[in-house]
């Protein structure tokens, strides 16, 4: 009976006894034989129990309890579960506890009847206090993985309290950490980027820009740093390789153009002006000179030995001023980087030419440098590697005049902009559509193969920019993006050359101050003074050049000082033309030109500083009229026999020399004429009536003329043309004098350039005129490959004893 009733009670209420007071896991294993009579029954029975009452059933129950206790200790770590599971079990205990209350009444009735049986089983509940303490002890023996979440929650709960209790101790520790983290985040999320620009004078300019800054932002900063107003000729380049550059687009973000690389750029001349004399400010011409010097030194602008020596002499004159033996010494030219293959002979020639310059300002030297450099074939040409349809390596050059094709460093074809109808590219091919000629009916398309698609697109962009800048009066509007539109929307976004010249004419500011690289002019002046410098005197001009008429500054700077006094000298000599027996030797003429005008020019410069602006303008206008009248009278006969023959035999010429034309050279056919004249001349002084006998000198004059056949559609005698510019370049040595006269005229809407070069050689020994002529023509063709020789005159005067 007792066993059946105990099993019945155990089956009816096992959950109620298992889930009370946090002892669910342990009690489920140790209280299975306990009858569900409630928690109070064992306590009451335990109090009534006497220590003397021991029966066999009691001993068996104690043994069973000791075995269960040992098992509970062994499996205590396995029976304990995480907190989340315990909480869920507690909820179940509450639900089961409600159901267990209904059964209490039934259990009480049964408890009275089974009092004896319960009394026998009461000692089983005696170790209950021990079982209550076991879970608390076992919690400390759980694995760290199970206790870590609970410990972390406790720490989080305790942190605010601990902070409130111990504010003074923990605040100084936590604040620096927060500040360091915040500062670290600021550096990481910095909106600015560092940009570095290498300028033409090899200095580095650095600036900070916003993260989304565009190309025009940094370009404006660079131009402001350089104090350049005529900024449209310049640009910033990104060098992808030592030989490949890409121009920075002013309308795009800088970050998108550098593609994550460093923001490092170089300042370069993007559009080379075809006529540098039209630039308004000296500082613009100076930076153009720096770019050309870099082009020559890097080999991008090849030139002959003679041209290189001439350009080098102007470079030295611009940087160090007039030559002074005490100051410069002997090897001062070697300090300049003039050529990639600089030799001792070149340095000696440059020094020899530099010593012949006197009273030439740096601005005049820069202008003479540009006037000679612009005649070179590769001046301002942007070279791109390509291949023709047959796979032959060629080079495509883009310049202000159009597209040019080079093969083995020789120009084999040229496509001027007026003849180009369309330029396009497809994949890695580049196409030029040519306008049909007078005898052609259809348009022709010429294709070239470039190394990659990117190279073809780059060439196309360069062509678009050059054509827009030099040929159009205003830029085209950028087309809007349309759905499924074909073609590129790229357009040149800056100002054109016409707009730049118009803006330059409106410049009204004092001449900007700038320091020349490597200049040694700060320690001395032209007259030997210790304080005043030519640079300082140049900066005292009240206004800049654009205040004067547009064409006047070019003539003023191009014409050296001696030209001012040539007109009065010529006027005095004209009445003597009727005296054939009296003439002046070329050597005397050279001496007259050297000695007379220099002091007058320097005096004018000193007086100009004390005059008002109106007086300066009137003074320069009068000089301009003198120069214009003199240059227009260049074809007129000269007083000497030698000058008269030169001028009268060359009414139409593009390039003429005092020498013979080399046989076999390209150009129009030349007709040879020879004149031999024997005349008597006296050595008496001009203007004096001979009052005594003067020894006669017999002179043999021999003139050989090579003249090209004239074109039928050009008649220079009937249409003299409008004079644009004219200037003279003179270089002297101990035995020869070279004078180059360059004149530009416009006839019938066509610009014509006339270059006349005269070489006067004096000496007692025999001279090989043929060799001199060959050398002169060779140098001329290297300097002016686009021009042809129309006339050559060899004039020889020999005194017969």
Swiss-Prot record:
GO molecular function: actin binding; calmodulin binding; structural molecule activity
PANTHER family registered for this protein in UniProt: 4.1 G PROTEIN (PTHR23280), PROTEIN 4.1 (PTHR23280:SF12)
A Gene Ontology cellular-component term: cytoskeleton
Subcellular location: Nucleus; Cytoplasm, Cytoskeleton; Cytoplasm, Cell cortex
Biased composition, class Low complexity, residue ranges: 45-58
Basic and acidic residues: bias regions: 88-107, 167-182, 563-577, 604-613
Comp. bias (Acidic residues): 108-117, 154-166
Xref: SUPFAM superfamilies: PH domain-like, Second domain of FERM, Ubiquitin-like
Subunit relationships: Binds with a high affinity to glycophorin and with lower affinity to band III protein. Associates with the nuclear mitotic apparatus. Binds calmodulin.
Gene field: epb41
Region (C-terminal (CTD)): 653-801
Protein name, entry field: Protein 4.1
PTM annotation, UniProt: Phosphorylated at multiple sites by different protein kinases and each phosphorylation event selectively modulates the protein's functions.
Organismal lineage: Eukaryota, Metazoa, Chordata, Craniata, Vertebrata
InterPro entries cross-referenced by the UniProt entry: Band_4.1_C, Band_41_domain, EPB4.1_FERM_F1, Ez/rad/moesin-like, FA, FERM/acyl-CoA-bd_prot_sf, FERM_2, FERM_central
Keyword Nucleus found: yes
Location of the region described as Hydrophilic in the Swiss-Prot/TrEMBL record: 477-587
GO biological process: actomyosin structure organization; cell division; cortical actin cytoskeleton organization; positive regulation of protein localization to cell cortex
General function of this protein: Protein 4.1 is a major structural element of the erythrocyte membrane skeleton. It plays a key role in regulating membrane physical properties of mechanical stability and deformability by stabilizing spectrin-actin interaction. May be required for dynein-dynactin complex and NUMA1 recruitment at the mitotic cell cortex during anaphase.
Biased composition (Polar residues): 141-151, 591-601
Presence of keyword Lipid metabolism: no
A Pfam short name: FERM_M
SMART domains in the record: B41, FA, FERM_C
Originating species: Xenopus laevis
Tissue: Found exclusively in photoreceptors following the terminal mitosis of retinal neurons. When retinal synaptogenesis is complete, protein 4.1 is also expressed in the inner retina. In adult amphibian retinas, protein 4.1 is detected in photoreceptors, bipolar cells, and ganglion cell axons.
UniProt keyword annotations, A-Z: Actin-binding, Calmodulin-binding, Cell cycle, Cell division, Cytoplasm, Cytoskeleton, Mitosis, Nucleus, Phosphoprotein, Transport
Location of the region described as Disordered in the Swiss-Prot/TrEMBL record: 1-187, 516-613
């Amino acid at each position: 009976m007792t066993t059946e009733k105990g099993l019945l009670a155990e089956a009816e209420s096992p959950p109620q006894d298992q889930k009370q007071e946090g002892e669910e896991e342990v009690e489920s294993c140790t209280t299975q034989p306990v009858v569900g009579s409630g928690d109070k029954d064992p306590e009451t029975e335990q109090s009534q129990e006497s220590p003397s009452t021991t029966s066999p059933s009691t001993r068996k129950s104690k043994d069973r309890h000791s075995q269960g206790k040992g098992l509970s200790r062994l499996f205590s770590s396995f029976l304990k579960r995480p907190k989340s599971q315990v909480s869920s079990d507690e909820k179940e205990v509450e639900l089961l506890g409600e159901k267990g209350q209904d059964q209490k009444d039934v259990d009480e009735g049964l408890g009275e009847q089974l009092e004896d049986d319960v009394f026998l089983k009461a000692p089983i509940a005696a170790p209950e206090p021990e079982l209550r303490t076991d879970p608390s002890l076992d919690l400390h023996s759980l694995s760290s993985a199970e206790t870590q979440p609970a410990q972390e929650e406790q720490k989080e709960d305790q942190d605010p309290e601990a902070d409130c209790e111990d504010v003074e101790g923990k605040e100084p520790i936590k604040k620096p950490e927060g500040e360091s983290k915040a500062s670290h985040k600021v550096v990481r999320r910095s909106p600015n980027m560092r940009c570095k620009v290498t300028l033409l004078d090899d200095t580095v300019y650095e600036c900070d820009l916003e993260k989304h800054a565009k190309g025009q932002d940094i370009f404006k900063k660079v131009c402001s740093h350089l104090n350049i107003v005529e900024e449209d000729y310049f640009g910033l380049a990104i060098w992808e390789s030592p030989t490949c550059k890409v121009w920075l687009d002013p309308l795009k973000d800088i970050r998108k153009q550098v593609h994550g690389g460093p923001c490092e750029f170089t300042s370069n001349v993007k559009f080379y002006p075809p006529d540098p004399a039209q630039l308004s400010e000296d500082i613009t011409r100076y930076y153009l000179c720096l770019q050309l010097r870099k082009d020559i030194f890097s080999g991008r602008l090849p030139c002959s030995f003679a041209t290189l020596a001439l350009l080098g002499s102007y470079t030295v004159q611009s940087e160090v001023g007039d030559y002074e033996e005490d100051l410069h010494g002997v090897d001062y030219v070697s300090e300049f980087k003039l050529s990639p293959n600089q030799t001792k002979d070149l340095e000696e020639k440059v020094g020899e030419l530099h010593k012949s310059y006197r009273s030439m300002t740096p601005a005049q030297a820069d202008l003479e440098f540009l006037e000679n450099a612009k005649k070179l074939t590769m001046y301002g040409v942007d070279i791109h590697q390509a291949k023709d349809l047959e796979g032959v390596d060629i080079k495509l050059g883009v310049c202000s005049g159009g597209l040019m094709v080079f093969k083995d460093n020789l120009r084999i074809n040229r496509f001027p902009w007026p003849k180009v109808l369309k330029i396009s590219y497809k994949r890695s091919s580049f196409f030029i559509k040519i306008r049909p000629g007078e005898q052609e009916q259809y348009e022709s398309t010429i294709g070239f193969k470039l190394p990659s698609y990117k190279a073809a697109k780059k060439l196309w962009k360069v062509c678009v920019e050059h054509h827009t800048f030099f040929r159009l009066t205003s830029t085209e509007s950028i087309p809007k993006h349309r759905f499924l539109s074909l073609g590129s929307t790229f357009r040149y976004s800056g100002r054109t050359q016409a707009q730049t010249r118009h803006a330059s004419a409106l410049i009204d500011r004092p001449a900007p101050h700038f320091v020349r690289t490597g200049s040694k002019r700060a320690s001395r002046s032209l007259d030997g003074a210790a304080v005043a410098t030519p640079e300082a005197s140049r900066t005292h001009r009240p206004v800049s050049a654009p205040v004067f008429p547009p064409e006047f500054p070019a003539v003023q700077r191009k014409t050296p000082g001696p030209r001012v006094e040539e007109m009065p000298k010529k006027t005095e000599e004209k009445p003597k033309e009727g005296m054939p027996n009296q003439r002046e030797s070329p050597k005397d003429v050279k001496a007259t030109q050297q000695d007379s005008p220099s002091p007058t020019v320097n005096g004018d410069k000193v007086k100009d500083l004390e005059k008002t602006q109106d007086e300066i303008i009137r003074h320069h206008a009068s000089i301009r009229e003198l120069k214009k009248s003199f240059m227009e009278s260049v074809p007129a006969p000269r007083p000497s026999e030698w000058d008269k023959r030169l001028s009268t035999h060359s009414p139409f010429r593009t390039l003429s020399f005092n020498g013979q034309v080399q046989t076999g050279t390209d150009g129009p056919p030349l007709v040879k004429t020879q004149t031999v004249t024997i005349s008597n001349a006296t050595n008496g002084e001009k203007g004096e009536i001979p009052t005594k006998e003067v020894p006669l000198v017999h002179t043999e004059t021999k003139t050989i003329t090579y003249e090209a056949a004239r074109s039928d559609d050009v008649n220079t005698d009937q249409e003299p043309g409008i004079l644009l510019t004219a200037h003279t370049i003179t270089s002297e040595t101990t035995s020869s004098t070279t004078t180059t006269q360059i004149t530009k005229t416009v006839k019938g809407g066509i610009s014509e350039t006339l270059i006349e070069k005269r070489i006067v050689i004096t000496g007692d020994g025999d001279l090989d005129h043929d060799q001199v002529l060959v050398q002169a023509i060779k140098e001329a063709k290297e300097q002016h490959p686009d021009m042809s020789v129309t006339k050559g005159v060899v004039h020889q005067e020999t005194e017969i004893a």
